[in-house]
Amino acid sequence: MSNSDSSSPLPESGRIAHRAKAADQTGWGRWLPGLRTLRGYQVAWLRHDIVAGLVLTTMLVPVGIAYAVASGVPGIYGLYATIVPLLAYALFGPSRILVLGPDSSLAAVILAVVLPLSGGDPLRAVALAGMMAVVSGTVCILAGLVRLGFVTELLSKPIRYGYMNGIALVVLISQLPKVFGFSIESEGPLRDVWAISTAVMDGESNWTTFMVGAGTLVVILLLKGNKRLPGILIAVAGATVAAGVLDLAARAEVSVLGSLPQGLPAFAIPWITTTDIVPVIIGGCAVALVSFADTSVLSRVYAARTRTYVDPNQEMVGLGVANLAAGFFQGFPISSSSSRTPVAEAAGARTQLTGVVGALAVALLLVVAPDLLQSLPTSALAAVVIASAIGLIEVTDLRRIYRIQRWEFWLSIVCTVGVAVLGAIPGIGLAIVIAVIEFLWDGWRPYSAVLGRAEGVKGYHDIKRYPDARLIPGLVLFRWDAPLFFANAELFHDRVLEAVATSPTPVRWLVVAAEPVTSVDVTSADMLAELDETLHASGIELCVAEMKDPVKDKLKRFGLFARLGETAFFPTMGAAVNSYLQTHPVDWVDWEDRVR
C-alpha cells in the first residue's frame, strides 16, 4: 500500500468523491470552486504550490510563445493567453491542479480561421483569434449552465483518437517550413507537403535554421520522459543562448523572436468585420468541442488521482470563463494541457494556487525582462510545437482497438484522413457526423433473439446460442437488446413479425422481453400500436415482460398501457410463461418439473 502525503487534499480512506457530494454545494461555492478551495486551504500546501508554480513557469513561457506562433499570431499573445486565463480558471475551475493555456491541439483550428482571413495583418489575426476565444467561451459557459457537460462523451474514444491524430499531423506539417527556414502559402495539409518538398528540393532551406530546430526537437524528445530535467526549458534555453552568442540572426539569417513589448495585457474587445462572423463562429464552436473534450478527459484523470470529484458542467463553465478572459485580454482560445499539468503535478501542486503563481511569474517577466527571449529562434519554437504534436498521436491504443474491434479502428482512420485532407475544422465536422452515424448505427441494428428453454439452465435463452433450447408451442418469447426509438422502430416491427412467421407452431401469444429496453419514444410507441393491431388481426396477443417502471410510465403517457391492458404486462418472463400455460393447454413439460 502506498503512503500518500498527509498534506495532499484527499478524502478519507473508504470514501469516493462523487457528484452526490458536489450537489451539496450551493450558492457561490457551487459556481466559484476557487473560493471553496480557499476556505479549506491548508498552510502546509503553500510551499508545494509556490514551488510547483515556479517550476511550471519554465514551461509556460516557451510553450505559450510557440503555440501562439503556431496559431498564426505573434508570440507575445501566447503569454497574454497564459496569464489572465490561469487566474480566471483558478476561481471558476473545479479541478485542483489542471493547467490551462495555449495548446497544440487548438493551433490547427485557430490557424485554419486566422490565416485566410487576416491577410498577413498580425493585429487582424489577433482580433480574429480573440473573437474565436470569446465564441468558444460563450458556448462552453452556456453548455455548462444547461448541463451539457456530457456532450463530449458522445464522441467515442476511436473517433477522438482519429481527429486528434489528424490535428497532430496538420500541426506538424504547418511547422515544417519554420524548421527548414522558409515560408509557403498554405493551401491545405496535402498541398503543403508537396510545397514543402518542392521548396527543399529547390534549395530554399536554411540549413543553420534546420540544425537549430532539429537539435531542439531531439533534445526535447530525449528528455521527454525525464521528470527531473525540464526538456523544453533546456532545449529552448540552449537554442536561445546559441543564437545570441553566435549572432545567428545576422550571420546565418536565422529567424528569431525579437523584442517583446513590455507590460501586461490590457482589456480590449476583439472587433471583427461582418464578413468574418460566420467562419469565426464555426471556428469558435470547433474550438469549444476540441478543448472541452481534451479538458474533460484530463480533468477526470487527475480527479481520479486525487480522489476528488469534478463536475463536468462546472468544468465547462470554468473553461468558458477562461476563454472569455483570454479573448478580452488580447489572448486566443485555450485548453487544458497534457504536457504542463503533469509538470505541475510532479512538482507537488496541491491547488490552483500553482497556476496563479505561474501566471504572476509570467506577468513579472513581461514587466521586468521582456527582452530575455529576443534571440529565441523561431525554428526552436516550431520544434516545441512539433514535439507536442507528436505527443498527441495515439498509436498504442489504436493497435488494441484494431485487434478487438476492427471497424472502430477504421472509423478512427477515416477521421484522421478527413482532418489531414479536408483541414482541421471540416475534419472535426466529419468526426462529429461519423460519431452521430456510429451512435445511430449501434441503436439502429441492435441484437434481438427468440428465447427458448434450455435443459438444465434457469431462465429463457437465445435459441441461436442454445441450439437445443425448446420452444413452448404457440408462444414466442422475443428479446430486443436496445432502447426503442425512431431509428430502429421499423426494424423491431419487422423482426417481431419474422419471429412469428418462422415459429414452428401457430402463435397465440408474443411476449417481448423488455428488460434491455431503456427508453421508448413517440415513433416507436406508434409502431407498437400498429404492431398490436397487426398481431390482433391474426389472433395473436401482444404481451410485455420485465419492462422497467420509467419505460412503463412513458407507455402510460402514450396511451399504450391502456390499449394493451394491465394484464398484458408481467413482472418476469416466468410469470408471463406461467400465465400462458394456465390459459392455453399445450403439450409442455418443463425440465424443472421432471427433476421433481
Can you annotate each of these PLM segments?
Residues 1-32, 444-596:
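Cytosolic C-terminal regulatory domains/tails of membrane transporters and channels
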Residues 2-458, 464, 472, 497, ...:
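Transmembrane helical cores of multi-pass ion-transport proteins
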